[in-house]
């Protein structure tokens, strides 16, 4: 098989929270959490969003808490 020619170079994604100086992810901030949930209601992985491992863990906990408090739906619409 021949190697791939051309194409675009992949750009490194920057962590949203590190870039904006956000240190605490609040489960009550539904608008922020919705950015990291798919239209089906699943938590988007790091390779899609570009968040760092530290903030991905905090984000997951915040989304799960928001779901438990009925601020976010478990399933998409």
Curated annotation (Swiss-Prot):
Secretion signal, residue range per the UniProt entry: none
InterPro entries the record matches: Ribosomal_bS18 (IPR001648), Ribosomal_bS18_CS (IPR018275), Ribosomal_bS18_sf (IPR036870)
MF terms (GO), sorted A to Z: small ribosomal subunit rRNA binding; structural constituent of ribosome
Pfam families in alphabetical order: Ribosomal_S18
Alphabetic keyword roster: Ribonucleoprotein, Ribosomal protein, RNA-binding, rRNA-binding
Annotated PANTHER family: 30S RIBOSOMAL PROTEIN S18 (PTHR13479), SMALL RIBOSOMAL SUBUNIT PROTEIN BS18M (PTHR13479:SF40)
Protein name: Small ribosomal subunit protein bS18
């Amino acid at each position: 098989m021949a190697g791939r020619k051309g194409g675009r170079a992949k750009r490194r994604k920057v962590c949203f929270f590190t870039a904006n100086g956000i240190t605490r992810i609040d489960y009550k901030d539904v608008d922020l959490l919705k950015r990291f949930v798919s239209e089906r209601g699943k938590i988007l992985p790091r390779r899609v969003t570009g968040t760092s491992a530290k903030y991905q863990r905090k984000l997951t906990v915040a989304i799960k808490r928001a779901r438990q408090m009925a601020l976010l739906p478990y399933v998409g619409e």
